[in-house]
Amino acid sequence: MEKLQKMTSEKSLVIFSKNSCCMSHTIKTLFLDLGVNPTIYELDEINRGKEIEQALAQLGCSPTVPVVFIGGQLVGGANQVMSLHLNRSLIPMLKRVGALWL
């Protein structure tokens, strides 16, 4: 859990993802299309990916990918991110943490 805290607090936007997950691809594409440069951890490619996935599950993330942290705070998965985007809360949130300047 401490490793997860360190990974998410050092960058303004962190996405935990898997290459094989279509929803992960959708969320990554959304942020890239907005002009944000997220830090992306592909859990199926990195060392200790399974361990990190278990830590995400302990935080209540289900499914465990994609999971988004903005400004070190857990936002949630694809449903939460898309809801924020549709109600126009996502961009102000990204601006507040310095992940988006325009």
From Swiss-Prot:
It is found in: Cytoplasm; Nucleus. Residues 1-101 form the Glutaredoxin domain. Keywords: 2Fe-2S, Cytoplasm, Iron, Iron-sulfur, Metal-binding, Nucleus, Redox-active center. A motif (Responsive for interaction with TGA factors) lies at residues 99-102. [2Fe-2S] cluster binds at C21. The keyword Signal does not apply. GO terms for cellular component: cytoplasm; nucleus. CDD domains: GRX_GRXh_1_2_like (cd03419). GO terms for molecular function: 2 iron, 2 sulfur cluster binding; metal ion binding. Signal peptide: none annotated. InterPro entries: GlrX-like_pln_2 (IPR011905), Glutaredoxin (IPR002109), Glutaredoxin_subgr (IPR014025), Thioredoxin-like_sf (IPR036249). May only reduce GSH-thiol disulfides, but not protein disulfides. PANTHER family: GLUTAREDOXIN. Belongs to the glutaredoxin family. CC-type subfamily. This is Monothiol glutaredoxin-S7. The lineage of its organism: Eukaryota, Viridiplantae, Streptophyta, Embryophyta, Tracheophyta.
